[in-house]
Amino acid sequence: NIIHKVLERFHGSEGDITEDQILQILDEEWKSGEFTYMQREEKLKEQAVEMLKRYVDNTKQEPPHVLDTELIFSFDLDGIRIVGMIDRIDNSPNGNKVVDYKTSKRSTPAKNSVQLGIYSLYLQQTEDEKLAGIPETATLYFLRDKEQPEHSHTFTETDLDSIREKITGVARGIRARRFAPCSGYHCDWCDYKNLACPAWES
């Protein structure tokens, strides 16, 4: 994802947080040859510029103290190998903060995010002293959201126990070859919707 790469470089560079800086990185990361239609490329570039300008405006008010970006991790959870990548980890006076960037149009509550819960589970057990411990906050940052881009939640031990149970339950289902369909808006772009999905059988 180009936006994720731009933000990784942006927070890894030294100096003040500026609009010119982030747009220069966008230009360097943008790969024009990967788009089939020029009109589509222009529209996507326009949207990227708008999102990043707004991000800078929001971020420069209280620049984060970034500990790490694009952190690849893995750990074992009750015999299940969990692998993932955390977009950004900040340090604040009250503890660490996990941030996950979203470019989707639909905003969702952070407290319902299994993804953020997994990040918190990893940090709870990591031996890296600067990162260890349940994050003070875990945040979904919706880059398209003009009104409230940040949706945050503090995961408790009870929350994490529930997420652990959910993950192990899914793993048991996969091992038993049980794949119950779960219909929703994500079905709109699923190739199996009209082919072999029992949830959409007429």
Task: Give the location of each predicted region.
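Secondary-structure transition/capping motifs at alpha-helix termini
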Residues: 13, 61-62, 92-95, 126-133
